[in-house]
Amino acid sequence: MIFKDYDFLQNYDLKNFEEKVKIYKELLSKFNRIHNLTHLKNIDENIFDSIKILDFYDFSKAKNIADIGSGAGFPAVFLAFLLQGNFHLFEPNPKKAAFLRTLKIECELSNLHIYKEKVQEYQNIFKADIITSRALMDVKPLLEICKNLKDENTVFILWKGSEIYQELENIKDYEIFENNLRKYCILK
C-alpha cells in the first residue's frame, strides 16, 4: 500500500511509518506461524482502516490514548507509529501481549505501553484523553469497563460495523464517520 497517496497523511513522517509497518508485518508473520494471533487476510487493508480515523479526528492534543482489547495491534499500534501521544494497550491474552511487547522493542516505540490485563482490573495512574477499541464489544459494556480510565473530557473512538446504530440507543452525544462498511464512532 502506498500511504503517501492519501491527503490526510501528508503531515506525517511516512518514511518512518512504512519502515515500522514492514517490521510489524515481518513480526506478525513470525508470531502468527506459532501463536495464531489473527486470521486477517489483508493486513494493508486493516492498517489503512486503523489510520483512516486521522481523516476525521484530530489526535494532536491527546497525551494519553488507551486501546481496549488490542489484539494484534489494530488500530493503536499504527496510530502510535504516526502520533506523539502515549498509547496504553490493554490486552489480557498472554500471546498477544507478548507480540505487542516484542513489537514495541523492535520498533523502538517508547510511547507504547502494554498491559497484560483486562482494563476493568487496572488500577489507574492516568486518565485517558481518548479511548479506542476496534469491534471488541457493544458500546454500553465498553463504557462501563472503562470507567476507571475516563473522566468528563475523555473521548471514545470506536471502530464498528453496521450494528453501531442499535448500540447507540439512548446515547446522545456522538458522531459517525463512514468509510465503506466501517463506521468510526466518536463518543464525547
Swiss-Prot record:
Enzyme class: transferase
Catalytic activity: guanosine(527) in 16S rRNA + S-adenosyl-L-methionine = N(7)-methylguanosine(527) in 16S rRNA + S-adenosyl-L-homocysteine
Pfam families: GidB (PF02527)
Binding site for S-adenosyl-L-methionine: G69, F74, V119, Q120, R134
One function term, GO molecular function aspect: rRNA (guanine-N7-)-methyltransferase activity
Range of residues in the leader sequence: none
E.C. no: 2.1.1.170
Family: Belongs to the methyltransferase superfamily. RNA methyltransferase RsmG family.
Function description: Specifically methylates the N7 position of guanine in position 527 of 16S rRNA.
PANTHER family cross-referenced by the UniProt entry: S-ADENOSYL-L-METHIONINE-DEPENDENT METHYLTRANSFERASES SUPERFAMILY PROTEIN (PTHR31760:SF0)
Protein name: Ribosomal RNA small subunit methyltransferase G
Organism: Campylobacter jejuni (strain RM1221)
